[in-house]
């Protein structure tokens, strides 16, 4: 029984697999009621890193289903990457053996990889954000402390200090993708501007008196937005 107030995501850890495309096509054909396609991208090996072409083609492959696309888990590590899955498995087995002995094995964040992590996440978010069907990106680890598989995949370090990637994403989200505008307009005339989706706070001055207002601009809304000033 489907709860219409919930958003259901068909999620897979390896979206490059043709089987996942087939599963989504099967769901569409059978009229399964779900909202979004979820995919994971844990880039802990050189082989697993998505190039710009890989990322765009992936989004295009799934856009034909006319569903929201979510990156439900992404990891871009600032620690050493492994060549491929076989090399990665050797490390994971060694780590598991140590953890079974009450010890631990974590990969240290490296300066050169912190620069790479910041640059890659900035480019990944920028390209993904530009695709009209992409609606959500979730970074799998906020901090390097107890990060998955011991990789330094957070945007905060083990002491919860911001890494370069934190500042790169902060600039994108809080500056580049925020709308700030100042308009001189006649009373009773509509205000027209281009802006990103989201919540807006505004201030209008009429006859020297300042009034505040707020509104939400969301996808799919093509009507004029009415606001109340107070």
What is each of the regions a protein language model found here?
Residues 1-20, 67-80, 135-144:
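Aromatic-lined carbohydrate-recognition surfaces of secreted/lumenal glycan-active proteins
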Residues 2-6, 29-33, 131-133:
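Short helix-capping segments at alpha-helix termini
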Residues 3, 12, 41, 132, ...:
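Sec/Tat-exported extracytoplasmic proteins
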Residues 11-14, 40-49, 106-116, 156:
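The substrate-binding groove and active-site-proximal loops of carbohydrate-active enzymes
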Residues 15-30, 49-59:
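Distinct, well-ordered alpha-helical segments
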Residues 29-32, 63-68:
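Short helix-capping and hinge/turn segments at secondary-structure transitions, especially at repeat
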Residues 54-66, 77-230:
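Aromatic-rich peripheral "rim/lid" segments of glycoside hydrolase catalytic domains that contact
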């Amino acid at each position: 029984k489907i709860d219409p107030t919930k958003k259901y995501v068909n999620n897979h850890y390896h979206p490059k697999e043709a089987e996942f495309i087939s599963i989504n096509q099967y769901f569409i054909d059978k009229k399964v009621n779900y909202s979004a396609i979820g995919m994971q991208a844990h880039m802990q090996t050189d082989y697993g890193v998505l190039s710009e072409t890989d990322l765009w083609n992936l989004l295009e492959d799934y856009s034909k289903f006319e569903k929201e696309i979510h990156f439900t888990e992404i990891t871009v590590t600032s620690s050493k990457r492994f060549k491929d899955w076989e090399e990665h498995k050797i490390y994971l087995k060694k780590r598991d053996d140590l953890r079974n002995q009450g010890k631990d094995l974590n990969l240290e964040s490296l300066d050169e990889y912190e620069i790479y992590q910041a640059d890659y996440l900035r480019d990944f978010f920028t390209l993904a954000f530009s695709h009209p069907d992409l609606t959500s990106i979730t970074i799998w680890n906020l901090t390097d402390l107890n990060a998955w598989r011991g990789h330094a995949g957070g945007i905060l370090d083990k002491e919860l200090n911001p890494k370069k990637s934190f500042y790169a994403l902060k600039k994108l989200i809080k500056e580049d993708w925020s709308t700030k505008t100042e308009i001189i307009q006649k009373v009773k005339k509509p205000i027209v501007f281009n802006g990103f989706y989201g919540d807006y706070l505004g201030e209008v001055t009429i006859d020297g008196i300042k009034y505040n207002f707020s509104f939400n601009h969301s996808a799919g809304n093509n009507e004029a937005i009415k606001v109340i000033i107070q």
